[in-house]
Design a protein with these regions (language model features):
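Cleavable N-terminal export/targeting peptides
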Residues: 1-31
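Short loop/turn motifs that connect adjacent beta-strands in outer-membrane beta-barrel proteins
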Residues: 20, 28-40, 68-76, 102-107, ...
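Gram-negative/organellar outer-membrane beta-barrel architecture
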Residues: 35-44, 50-189, 289, 348-349, ...
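Transmembrane beta-strands of outer-membrane beta-barrel proteins
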Residues: 42-44, 77-81, 106-110, 156-159, ...
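Sequence/structural signature of outer-membrane beta-barrel proteins
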Residues: 65-69, 84-88, 115-119, 164-168, ...
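Extracellular loop and loop/strand-boundary signature of outer-membrane beta-barrel proteins
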Residues: 81-82, 127-133, 177-184, 220-226, ...
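Outer-membrane beta-barrel "beta-signal"
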Residues: 194-195, 335-340, 345, 360-371
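C-terminal outer-membrane beta-barrel translocator/porin domains of Gram-negative envelope proteins
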Residues: 195-198, 204-303, 312
Length: 371
């Protein structure tokens, strides 16, 4: 679990902005500084954390909001960028974007980034020993882009390309990654075509309070697409949001998620349990295999204008074969967290989640909801 050394800016921002809700802003000489870090158009968030394999990591995140059309017919577009650097010389630079053209005639979704950061490799499959893990470091370039065209009300059809290059792989001597026949342990070049369908009538893509989201994406990788490994992948993501009480702003959210592959899949393209999105509480990648099915629900309770709390629970499992999930391998995920509305105009929350899994637990600090 990440040991958070300090979140100075975030904590100062929370308490100072909360005070501004109840007191005259002229009493705060640093109100301009607060406005600099958070405005209706962007959020800047410095951060720091510690991991044994990286030493101290410092970084900054920027989330930019803008509209390309009328607010009533075009939802908010956003670009989220982050830069991280560790005292061991590791770094990560990444930008993710969700762009709605005027009247949502087109929707573009993608990510581009480069990293040289270690991961912890526990093995592949359900039968792993959590104490026998090893660090793996590699250079990683990633570009994925999907362009959707509206084909009906809230319906979109999309085409895209994904290119991921893993190189300079450094493994533990005599470790699993070096001695076992693991796909991609010497590096890989993944290049493939994405074909996607999307239905989305959510009122807000970063913090929905109502609506339905359904996405099915099929990815093809092989020699013909310039890929070093031949495999296919299905991603299925369905979410539903509702307000259970008319006079309150509470939200009840549900998500079903499937990650299904076949073929020669590199280790870092396998389905992974854990992290800040799917199956919170587990270390990301502590369980990985060709296929993953998961379900989670979350209740978001608003307490004050800016503050709220959540409770979440879910279950999921991995398997080597697409149609073979054993009940005994289904694992639980549950926990709770705090929410602070860091941007009222776009209804964006800063979230802190504490999740528990099967013998694991983890804490997460992020901007925007998990789903």
């Amino acid at each position: 679990m990440k040991k958070v050394l300090f979140l100075t800016y975030l904590l100062l921002h929370l308490f100072q902005t909360q005070a501004l809700d109840f007191q005259d802003t002229t009493r705060f000489s640093n109100s301009k500084l607060i406005k600099f870090f958070t405005s209706p158009k962007y959020i800047i968030s410095p951060f720091a954390f510690y991991l044994p394999e990286t030493d101290l990591v410092i970084g900054v995140g920027l989330k930019k909001f803008y509209h390309l059309g009328n607010d009533s017919t075009t939802r908010t577009s956003n670009v989220a960028s982050s830069l991280q650097y560790s005292l061991n010389g590791q770094f990560l630079l990444r930008s993710q974007y969700q762009i709605f053209a005027k009247d949502e005639k087109y929707y573009i979704n993608g990510v581009i980034g480069f990293s040289r950061f270690p991961i912890t490799f526990y093995g592949i499959g359900n039968q792993i020993d959590m104490t026998k893990n090893e660090p793996v470091t590699y250079d990683y370039f990633r570009f994925e882009n999907l362009i959707y065209r509206k084909i009906g009300k809230n319906n979109f059809a999309g085409l895209g390309w994904r290119y991921l290059n893993t190189f300079n792989v450094k493994t533990q001597q005599n470790g699993k990654m070096e001695t076992e026949p693991i796909e991609g342990n010497k590096g890989s070049t993944i290049s493939g075509l994405n074909i996607s369908y999307l239905f989305d009538n959510r009122d807000n893509i970063l913090n929905p309070s109502k609506g339905f989201f359904s996405q099915v994406t099929y990815s093809i990788h092989g020699n013909i697409t310039g890929s070093s490994h031949t495999f296919n992948r299905w991603l299925v993501d369905a979410r539903y949001y509702l307000k259970p009480f008319r006079k309150r702003e509470d939200v009840l959210a549900f998500q079903g998620y499937g990650f299904l592959t076949n073929g020669n899949v590199p280790f870092n393209e396998l389905a992974q349990m854990g992290g800040d999105i799917i199956m919170r509480g587990y270390f990301q990648g502590s369980y990985r295999d060709k296929n993953l099915l998961a379900f989670q629900s979350e209740y978001r309770l608003q307490l004050l204008k800016r503050w709220g709390i959540v409770g979440f629970a879910g279950a999921g499992g991995i398997s080597n074969e697409m149609g073979y999930f054993e009940l005994k391998n289904i694992m639980p995920s549950y926990g709770g967290g705090l929410r602070f509305k860091i941007n009222r105009k776009e209804n964006v929350n800063l979230r802190m989640d504490y999740g528990f899994g099967n013998g694991q637990q983890n804490i997460y600090f992020f901007i925007a909801e998990a789903f």
